[in-house]
């Protein structure tokens, strides 16, 4: 909860070839009392770094709805790094075949009516789950000197101010210059973008038969998302849209 980072053990089960980007995924089973308490791998944990013997191997990106939520798919870090290699073209598609669901937290919409949220949901045509929630809205400050670490909760904003629209995920890796990778799957798969990156406060992990999810809200704008690609989102902390 809050800004706390926590860890949990997981075992590798298999390596699975994927029919679309990313081309390989690592099947894991999460274990431990924390995972049992929250009901498995939650949406919004996407981007959570996965280490083997202290080495960053990748990040949790996918799972299955209405299934065993302890099972998940890790996007290898070499696949995630491809987010930096795409040419600046918008709307690049990663492939049509899906055998899993991204662990993307719902798009939280605050400051508008349920009817307005339903319209936003229709506009996205099922690309992302839209959840209206009466969280406090208003001005979100900018943290020009934010220091984030792998495992921190982060978010992407589409709107902020009197109306807030955004999602919550997890930071996977960041270098000394502030270049980062997160989510381990696309946000909206829009290609070359300029979305605010936020530090997120996690209120609670909400249990669900479909898939548990992290309920978070933005604390401050800390950087910019420049790439929204099939393997990950990427951008720079300390730079802004």
PLM-predicted stretches and their roles:
Residues 1-241:
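Terminal presequence/propeptide segments associated with secretion/organelle targeting
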């Amino acid at each position: 909860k809050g800004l706390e980072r926590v860890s949990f053990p997981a075992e590798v089960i298999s390596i699975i070839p994927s029919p679309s980007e990313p081309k390989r995924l690592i099947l894991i089973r999460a274990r431990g009392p924390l995972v049992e308490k929250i009901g498995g791998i939650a949406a919004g944990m996407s981007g959570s770094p996965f280490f083997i013997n202290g080495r960053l191997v990748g990040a949790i990106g996918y799972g299955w709805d209405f299934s065993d939520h302890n099972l998940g798919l890790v996007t290898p870090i070499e696949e995630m790094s491809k987010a930096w290699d795409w040419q600046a073209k918008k709307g690049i598609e990663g492939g049509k075949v899906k055998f899993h669901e991204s662990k993307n937290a719902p798009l939280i919409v605050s400051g508008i009516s349920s009817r307005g949220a339903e319209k936003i949901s229709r506009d996205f045509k099922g690309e992302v789950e839209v959840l209206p929630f009466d969280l406090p809205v208003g001005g979100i400050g900018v943290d020009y000197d934010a220091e984030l670490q792998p495992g921190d909760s982060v978010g992407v904003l589409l709107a902020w101010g009197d109306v807030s629209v955004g999602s919550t995920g997890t930071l996977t890796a960041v270098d000394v210059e502030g270049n980062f990778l997160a989510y381990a799957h696309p946000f909206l798969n829009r290609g070359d973008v300029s979305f605010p990156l936020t530090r997120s406060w996690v209120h609670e992990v909400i249990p669900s038969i479909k898939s548990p999810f992290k309920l978070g809200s933005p604390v401050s704008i800390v950087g910019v998302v420049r790439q929204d690609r099939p393997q990950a989102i990427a951008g720079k902390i300390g730079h802004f849209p």
